[in-house]
Amino acid sequence: MTESVRLPAASPKPSTVALPGSKSISNRTLLLAALSDNVCEIHSLLKSDDTDRMLEALDKLGVQIEHLAEGRLKVHGTGGRFPNRSADLFLGNAGTAFRPLTAALAVLGGDYHLHGVPRMHERPIGDLVDALRIAGADVEYLGNEHYPPLHIGKRQDCGERVIPIKGNVSSQFLTALLMALPLTGQAFEIRMVGELISKPYIDITLKLMAQFGVQVANEGYRVFKIPADAHYHAPEHLHVEGDASGASYFLAAGLIAATPVRVTGIGANSIQGDVAFARELEKIGADVVWGENFVEVSRPKGRAVQAFDLDANHIPDAAMTLAIVALATRQTCTLRNIGSWRVKETGRIAAMANELRKLGAKVVEEAEAIHITPPETPTPDAVIDTYDDHRMAMCFSLISLLGVPVVINDPKCTHKTFPTYFEVFSSLTETAE
C-alpha cells in the first residue's frame, strides 16, 4: 500500500527556514573536487538520494572522501584521473550525477557500466553521447538507443577540437561536456546546435568551474571555449549555497498566505538562476526583501495574487511551484517554454495536469506549455499522486494553504533533494481545522 501524508488546511506563521544545500551545486562540486589536484573541504553539502549516488560512485572510482560532520566532508582530488579504471555505477534517478559522470568517464576512458532506476533509462542522453563520440569517446548503449544504461570504453583522440551539441532537451548535457573536456588538457570549442534551454544552470557550471581554476569563454551562449592546459585546482574550503529550487515552496507560502516567510542560505548574490522565482512572485503581488544570505516574501492581506503568463525557460524547476500559485489567483494562468518538464523525474506536464484536475482546476496541456484555470475552491482531501518526483510532492503541499486539506502519496520521494521537507513545512504552519 502506498504511504501517504494528510496535510490539514493550514496557514504559515511568520517563519525563517534554513535551506538544505543546493543539489545542482552539491553534485557539481563533488565531481570537480574529485577531479582536482588538491584537497577540498566542502561545507553545507546536501544530504539526499542524489548526492548519495554521486558519493557512492566516487567511492567506487577510488576517490578518498573523509566525512567530517553532517554536511561537511573533505575530498582528496585525484589530479584528473580516477584511480579505478573499471567500475559498475548505479546512479538511481540522479541526472546531476549520471550526465556529468558519463562525460568525465568517457573523456578519461576505461571500462565503466552506468545504470539507474527504470525512469533514468527513459531519460534521453543521446545528444550528450553524440557529442562525446565526436570527441573520440567510446560509449555504447546497452538498452534502447539514445538512453541509458551505458558502457564506456577507452577514448581515442581523433584530433577533433570543435564539438557541436544540442541544448534543447537538457542543459545538463552541456554542463557535462563543459566539466569533462578540461580533463584532456586540450583546447576545445563547444558550439550549440539550436536553442539552449535553462541558461542559468550553465551559469552555475561556469562559475563553479572558475572557482576550481578553469575559465571558460562564453560567447553569447552559442560558443564556449575551453583553454589548453586547463586543470582543476580546488579552493581549500567551499560553502554550498542553499537550494533555490527548494526555497520556492516556502517563498510561495509567504505569497499565498500573506505571511512573511524568510529563507536563509541564498540571497541577492546567489549563483543559482532559481532565485529569479522571487522576482516573478514580486510581479504578481509579493513584497520581496533581499539580503546577502536571505530572501523574504510576504503580501499585504488586501492585495490579490495576480494571474500570470510567463515564459519559464529560466526557472524550469521553480516554475512547477507557480503552477500551484495559479490556484490562488482568479483567472487563467499560463507557463510557457517548459518542454524540459517532459524529460525530468517524470513527465511533469502530464503529471501536473492530472493532479491539478483532481483539485477542480481546468487544465490545457501543450507540448511546451500549460494553461491553468483555478476552481472557486480546490477540492478538499484530493489524493495527489507524486510519480516518484520530489518536486510534485513539495509543490502540492502548498494546497493546504488554500483552505483545504490535501493527501500526498509517497511523501518520501522528497528524499531525492530535501529529506526533511514535510517536517520543515509542518513546523511553519498552524492548522486551521
Curated annotation (Swiss-Prot):
One GO biological process term: aromatic amino acid family biosynthetic process
Reaction catalysis annotation: 3-phosphoshikimate + phosphoenolpyruvate = 5-O-(1-carboxyvinyl)-3-phosphoshikimate + phosphate
Binding site for 3-phosphoshikimate: 23-24, 28, 170-172, 198, 317, 344
Gene3D superfamilies: Enolpyruvate transferase domain
Protein name from the UniProt record: 3-phosphoshikimate 1-carboxyvinyltransferase
InterPro entries per UniProt: Enolpyruvate_Tfrase_dom, Enolpyruvate_Tfrase_sf, EPSP_synthase, EPSP_synthase_CS, RNA3'P_cycl/enolpyr_Trfase_a/b
Pathway this chain belongs to: Metabolic intermediate biosynthesis; chorismate biosynthesis; chorismate from D-erythrose 4-phosphate and phosphoenolpyruvate: step 6/7
SUPFAM superfamilies from the UniProt entry: EPT/RTPC-like
Organism this protein belongs to: Neisseria gonorrhoeae (strain ATCC 700825 / FA 1090)
